[in-house]
Curated annotation (Swiss-Prot):
Organism, as annotated: Bos taurus (Bovine)
Family annotation (SUPFAM superfamilies): Cyclophilin-like
Protein name: Peptidyl-prolyl cis-trans isomerase B
Highest taxon listed in the record's lineage: Eukaryota
Coiled coil regions, renumbered to chain: none
Subcellular location, principal: endoplasmic reticulum
Lineage of the species this protein comes from: Eukaryota, Metazoa, Chordata, Craniata, Vertebrata
Residue span(s) of domain PPIase cyclophilin-type: 47-204
Subunit structure and binding partners: Interacts with DYM. Interacts with CALR, CLGN and CANX. Part of a large chaperone multiprotein complex comprising DNAJB11, HSP90B1, HSPA5, HYOU, PDIA2, PDIA4, PDIA6, PPIB, SDF2L1, UGGT1 and very small amounts of ERP29, but not, or at very low levels, CALR nor CANX.
EC number(s) reported in the record: 5.2.1.8
List of residues that carry N6-succinyllysine: K84, K209
S-nitrosocysteine modification, residue list: C202
Amino acid sequence: MLRLSERNMKILFVAALVVGSVFFLLLPGPSAADEKKKGPKVTVKVYFDLRIGDEDIGRVVIGLFGKTVPKTVDNFVALATGEKGFGYKDSKFHRVIKDFMIQGGDFTRGDGTGGKSIYGERFPDENFKLKHYGPGWVSMANAGKDTNGSQFFITTVKTAWLDGKHVVFGKVLEGMDVVRKVESTKTDGRDKPLKDVTIADCGKIEVEKPFAIAKE
């Protein structure tokens, strides 16, 4: 009887292993829908050290999506480093609208009518794969279709009405509180800050391993 009992226990043990393996194999893996929910990958970062008037208010670090919009990202990085002999350093955020966005990047005229890209004065819309999902997304400002230069804006709320019209290429990873300080600065009737909001310094931060962020 003892031998039969041991044999039965072994059979039951093996059966349990088989059933467990089958159950594990039948568990659903990540669906195509789940994969689509994954956000874009950050391949490089750019930092802005901002100043309002004579006060340094902190650093904003922006993650850029070089695999999704490589041409747009290359332009932004080069303007942040100044490697082409011109760029964002000492330029201003010339337009600030609370509960909407802050806009900068016009380093030639400083009033929203200038700026240029590393490809020439303007370059085409790369794609509209990404949307303005919420606060902190960075997108190209333009004057209509295919008129990208150097001007950009950072959202402070979800701005779905801009989807398909402006190329999204980055998101604020650090320093959203600094963006909020700029958003809250006093402006005139044309949305220009009463005190200059300046990019006192800027540059590139390498990313060793690209990582995805949430679309939120």
